[in-house]
Amino acid sequence: MDLNTRGIINYLLLPISGIFYLASVLRKWLYQVNFFKVKKFKCPVIVVGNITVGGTGKTPIVILLAQYFKQQGKQVGVVLRGYGGMHHKGSLLVSKNTNVYLSGDEPLLIALQADLPVMVNRNRAQAVEDLINQCQVNLIISDDGLQHYRMDRNIEIAVIDGTRRFGNEFFLPSGPLRESIDRLKSVDFVINNAGFRAGEFNIKLILKVFVNVKTGEEKPLDYFNGEYCHGVAGIGYPQRFFDTLIRLGINLKPHIFADHYVYQQSDLVFEDNYPILMTAKDCVKCIQFANNQMWYLQVEANLSDNFFKELEAKL
């Protein structure tokens, strides 16, 4: 079902969307009136989330923020729920050597690229508490968790897909909305991942190089220009990645997998011998069985100096 259009199925599911909306409003109100207790912490918490389902590019922003504050001398940690991982009980401290099937792809990717402590727990508030106690951090960034109201936060950052925006503007399951669009009025910052809108900060994803998953060898962006390649993506919005490869002049054979999909070696065996291109998020799940034909596209997030000035002022 397409969550960006208003088809028959979308309308048929509207009664369920109404129930979802009322339940989410009630739940938030119960936290606001202290019927449910909010867990407070010894150090600031920055939440990077969204109000829709589907990929909006939160993780590159989390990595960028973590690296920035590390350079400022902060002891930074990151918490996540660990979607796609097999760890379901209590907290898991993720390092560069953690099994990706245990942690999930995003926690391991952050641990590898940002080189800092990462804690996974379905209960984000508990993840924050455990990270403070075990790793002596003084700033925590939550990858997602905008709707996890049990976790107190100092800064809220909402990330929006600049192309799809809010889809058909229906609530789940008829549409992509987790919360009302008005929720954006209460967050501290709105980041747009495509295009410019008043009141929103624009993030640029800078394409760097292709990196061989097995050897670490790097090749320039035009290396596969004019070649036939397989494009593999198990992310929230794979078409964005495929469009990027096509703009690089690649004759693409796309293969879409579910978000957080756990790859098996057999998934990436094709009859031809064309190169296989993937995202960094896909890469961490393929390292154990990688071959010389597997490459990932290295990207780097960039936000304006003005954004960081305003962020530090609020923090």
Swiss-Prot record:
InterPro entries for the chain: LpxK (IPR003758), P-loop_NTPase (IPR027417)
Keyword Lipid metabolism: yes
E.C. number(s) listed in UniProt: 2.7.1.130
Enzyme class label: transferase
Pathway given in the UniProt record: Glycolipid biosynthesis; lipid IV(A) biosynthesis; lipid IV(A) from (3R)-3-hydroxytetradecanoyl-[acyl-carrier-protein] and UDP-N-acetyl-alpha-D-glucosamine: step 6/6
Catalytic reaction annotation: a lipid A disaccharide + ATP = a lipid IVA + ADP + H(+)
Gene Ontology MF terms: ATP binding; tetraacyldisaccharide 4'-kinase activity
Record key words, sorted: ATP-binding, Kinase, Lipid A biosynthesis, Lipid biosynthesis, Lipid metabolism, Nucleotide-binding, Transferase
Tagged with keyword Nuclease: no
Entry's Gene Ontology BP terms: lipid A biosynthetic process; lipopolysaccharide core region biosynthetic process
GO cellular component annotations of the record: plasma membrane
Residues that coordinate or bind ATP: T52, V53, G54, G55, T56, G57, K58, T59
Function comment: Transfers the gamma-phosphate of ATP to the 4'-position of a tetraacyldisaccharide 1-phosphate intermediate (termed DS-1-P) to form tetraacyldisaccharide 1,4'-bis-phosphate (lipid IVA).
Family: Belongs to the LpxK family.
Protein name: Tetraacyldisaccharide 4'-kinase
Organism of this sequence: Vesicomyosocius okutanii subsp. Calyptogena okutanii (strain HA)
Name of the gene: lpxK
